[in-house]
Amino acid sequence: MNVFEELFSVLAGGRVLDAATGEGGFIRVLHKHLNNYTEIVGIDCSGRMIINAQRKNKNHKVHFVQMNAGQIGFKEASFDTVSIAVSLHHLENVRQVLGEMKRVLKPGGKFIICEMHRDGMTEAQFNAIRIHHWAAEVDAALGTLHDRTFAQAEILDYVDELELYDVITREIQGINTDPLDDKTITSVGGYVEKYLQRAGQISSGEMFIQRGEELRRSLHEKGVQREPLLVVIGQKP
């Protein structure tokens, strides 16, 4: 039994909001592992992401809306479950988004946070973090918000501020995969290539390009594994 199955299979999701949903990847996790749910609504500020999410998630109980998670356009206490996954480090104001999610969550409802962190990594996981941080710096240089990965303690500080009860935390290490798996190397290598092209758009971007080329070499020498994930579930008072 994996961590998601362990935690989610006992949950009746009811009406679910997935904030900063991107292309709806975490919604597919919820759909697979929740005991049941009546509806899942995914919101994201990017229209392109919403279009991709709709294309990748063909389910009559799953809907997508273009919406800023910092100003959620739903009534107070209108969802039974809220979730946000691998998105905190993309947010301009983490507290505002989490506060909005708590506002639309019903009392007693479940608040789910799943976020990568940078603690206790293998060398291959460290490669993933280095690539992620480099890409974040390239995005920042081009005016796109993309912050560095949080430490686990920083994530838990945000959770503490929400004042949830019956909080459960689990960690997914992500080290049960071959760091030199050809498919993974090809996929991550494509990500690096995309950001090398973006780095070429930066005035005086030679430093970014040099670092990207070093990361590409390290990727093929040492491999890559997914960063550790912290999964948190709590209830709103």
PLM features per residue range, with description:
Residues 1-14, 29:
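Conserved alpha-helix/loop element of class I SAM-dependent methyltransferases that forms part
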Residues 17-19, 23-71:
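Class I SAM-dependent methyltransferase SAM/SAH-binding core
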Residues 83:
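A conserved beta-strand element that flanks and buttresses the S-adenosyl-L-methionine
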Residues 86-87:
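Short catalytic micro-motifs in class I SAM-dependent methyltransferases
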Residues 95-107:
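A short glycine-rich, Lys/Arg-flanked "PGG" loop and its adjoining helix->strand segment in the class I
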Residues 112-136:
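Conserved class I S-adenosyl-L-methionine
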Residues 147-163:
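Short alpha-helix
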Residues 165-237:
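Conserved Class I S-adenosyl-L-methionine
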